Curated annotation (Swiss-Prot):
Cofactor note: Binds 2 [4Fe-4S] clusters per subunit. One cluster is coordinated with 3 cysteines and an exchangeable S-adenosyl-L-methionine.
Organism per entry: Zea mays (Maize)
Name of the featured protein: Lipoyl synthase 1, chloroplastic
One GO BP annotation of this record: lipoate biosynthetic process
Pathway(s) this gene product operates in, as recorded in its UniProt entry: Protein modification; protein lipoylation via endogenous pathway; protein N(6)-(lipoyl)lysine from octanoyl-[acyl-carrier-protein]: step 2/2
GO CC entries: chloroplast; mitochondrion
Family in the record: Belongs to the radical SAM superfamily. Lipoyl synthase family.
CDD domains linked to this entry: Radical_SAM
């Protein structure tokens, strides 16, 4: 039976704004009864953009506006120091929960606040069709003081775990790897006990750039495959690729004993269950430890149309499946993003145990 979403949409349009990691905006589905587990309305096949005016946001995707004391304090500090965060630039729906320490948009949580700092500026050289980060072929040069300023800011917040990410910088000889590495080293010098996760670009597959960053003192090397193999050219910038992303993660894992690696997959772009399972197996085959899965939400009508709204029950299925095939930690849910509660205690213990094991062997 044809879905009411399966009607002609506007022709494909390459997103005028794009990037790698942002995700969010208003996602909506029909106000009818919720579909069975693992099913949802689908748009036509193909790289369609635009929004269907007849669809409505499902209840499980509604999120209160971010508020709370920790959130307000962190937002003020980031603004004063002129730092970029993927939480803001990519319109992440979990900004309140992560910045408040796991307590939702405004409640009290476990106290583990996580902010993802975006280095190398706020302008990406690539134009992935899912992302809200702005793009340009010639972004401004990196701020040479950014590594130190970032380290000073993070050290002042008193956090034990920080995520550093970046836009793609194909305009730089090393893709920005050395700038990234300088930031990690500055953080470790100011606060040796802090755990640092780096969510990186693919550096155009440059293994030396990957090695440089992987050897900088970081604790978790993250790089996202974003979607299943068959949808790569539709979803990501042509300069990115499934096999190239796997090669990045494989090389990072080999750079240091005890290295924890991580990746993420968006659902709702038209992938099949078998394709998701294959992507998981491909990641496990190269030793990836941590996986996150979340719903793709369309940032603007110029970005890819949501083709499926995956139910919370199906996300729970994927969490259990991921654990069954060997991932050491799986975060799976409609609003989960790459850095979702990255620093929670289980992940911190996983990283520290890996360090202890590698140093004693």
């Amino acid at each position: 039976m044809q879905s009411s979403l399966a009607r002609p949409l506007r022709p494909p349009v390459l997103a005028g704004r794009g990037g790698r990691r942002g995700l969010v905006a208003v996602a909506r589905c029909h106000a009818e009864a919720a579909p069975p587990v693992g099913t949802a309305s689908r748009a036509p096949a193909g790289p369609y953009t635009g929004r269907d005016p007849e669809v409505k946001k499902p209840a499980w995707l509604r999120q209160r506006a971010a508020q709370g004391e920790k959130y307000a304090r962190l937002r003020e500090s980031i603004g004063e120091l002129k730092l970029n965060t993927v939480c803001v630039e990519a319109q992440c729906p979990n900004i309140g929960e992560c910045w408040n320490g796991g307590g939702g948009a405004g409640g009290e949580g476990d106290g583990i606040a996580t902010a993802t700092i975006m280095v190398l500026g706020d302008t990406c050289t690539r134009g992935c069709r899912f992302c809200a980060v702005k793009t340009s072929n010639k972004p401004p040069p990196p701020d040479p003081l950014e590594p130190l300023n970032t380290a000073l800011a993070v050290a002042s917040w008193g956090v034990d775990y920080v995520v550093l990410t970046s836009v793609d910088r194909d305009d730089l000889p090393d893709g920005g790897s050395s700038h990234f590495a300088q930031t990690v080293k500055a953080l470790k010098e100011l606060k040796p006990g802090i755990l640092v996760e780096c969510l990186t670009s693919d550096f155009r597959g440059d293994l030396e750039a990957i090695s440089s960053l992987a050897s900088s003192g970081l604790d978790v090397y993250a790089h996202n495959i974003e979607t299943v193999r068959s949808l790569q050219r539709i979803v990501r910038d042509p300069r990115a690729g499934y096999d190239q992303s796997l090669a990045v993660l494989k090389h990072a894992k080999a750079c240091r004993e005890g290295m924890v690696t991580k990746s993420s997959i968006m659902l709702g772009l038209g992938e099949t269950d078998e394709e998701v399972k294959q992507a998981m197996m491909d990641l496990r085959a190269i030793g990836v430890d941590i996986l996150t899965l979340g719903q793709y939400l369309q940032p603007t009508e110029r970005h890819l149309t949501v083709r499926e709204y995956v139910t919370p029950e199906k996300f729970q299925f994927w969490k259990e499946y991921g654990e069954s095939v060997g991932f050491r930690y799986v975060a799976s849910g409609p609003l989960v993003r790459s850095s979702y509660r990255a620093g929670e205690l289980f992940v911190q213990n996983l990283v520290r145990n890996n360090k202890t094991g590698s140093s004693s062997s």
